[in-house]
Amino acid sequence: MEELIAKRYAKALMESCSEKELQAIEDALVAIAALFRDWKVKEFIISPEVEKSAKEEILLAPFKDAGKKFVHLIKLLAEKDRLEIIPALANELKIQRALKERKFDGVVYSEFKLSDNELKKIAEALSKKVNGEVVLHQGKEPYDGIKVEVNTVGIEIEFSKSKIKKQLIENILKAI
């Protein structure tokens, strides 16, 4: 439900803001969304016992340079009791901007570190596929094989040792 509401707000922002304003709003929303990872902060922000004006002040205080539209957005979200959608809105705005600019970020997970040249080759191949620019980064989580994710366009390519081993066993059993 939050994602659907966030899409509407993101669409409105995309239509009414300049690129510079969008960048400032996205940066501020991403920073606020990071606060939501702390359950105490999230509980405070979604609490009906806390005055809306107090929530607005706390959320707006660090972002004096984010612009009028950001201030209006936070006030509107507070007024409509929708501050809890900020993480979804930050994510949706990031996706919408990436789709508009045709610039996508992705992550490569593997049990070994890939060279910059290897990452670049994979990114170039994916860039042709999505008709845009793909920038890949090495993920920090180890993976039994290799996995490439570009979430904004829904790409997930994976080759794992366990999956290949399972397919080999299935093929051997079929051949018998």
Swiss-Prot record:
Keywords: ATP synthesis, Cell inner membrane, Cell membrane, CF(1), Hydrogen ion transport, Ion transport, Membrane, Transport. It holds the Pfam family OSCP. The keyword Ion transport applies. InterPro entries: ATP_synth_OSCP/delta_N_sf, ATPase_OSCP/dsu. One of its GO terms (cellular component) is plasma membrane. One of its GO terms (molecular function) is proton-transporting ATP synthase activity, rotational mechanism. It is a peripheral membrane protein. It is found in: Cell inner membrane. The keyword Ligase does not apply. Its main location: membrane. Coiled coil: none annotated. F-type ATPases have 2 components, F(1) - the catalytic core - and F(0) - the membrane proton channel. F(1) has five subunits: alpha(3), beta(3), gamma(1), delta(1), epsilon(1). F(0) has three main subunits: a(1), b(2) and c(10-14). The alpha and beta chains form an alternating ring which encloses part of the gamma chain. F(1) is attached to F(0) by a central stalk formed by the gamma and epsilon chains, while a peripheral stalk is formed by the delta and b chains. F(1)F(0) ATP synthase produces ATP from ADP in the presence of a proton or sodium gradient. F-type ATPases consist of two structural domains, F(1) containing the extramembraneous catalytic core and F(0) containing the membrane proton channel, linked together by a central stalk and a peripheral stalk. During catalysis, ATP synthesis in the catalytic domain of F(1) is coupled via a rotary mechanism of the central stalk subunits to proton translocation. HAMAP family: ATP_synth_delta_bact. Belongs to the ATPase delta chain family. This is ATP synthase subunit delta. It comes from Nitratiruptor sp. (strain SB155-2).
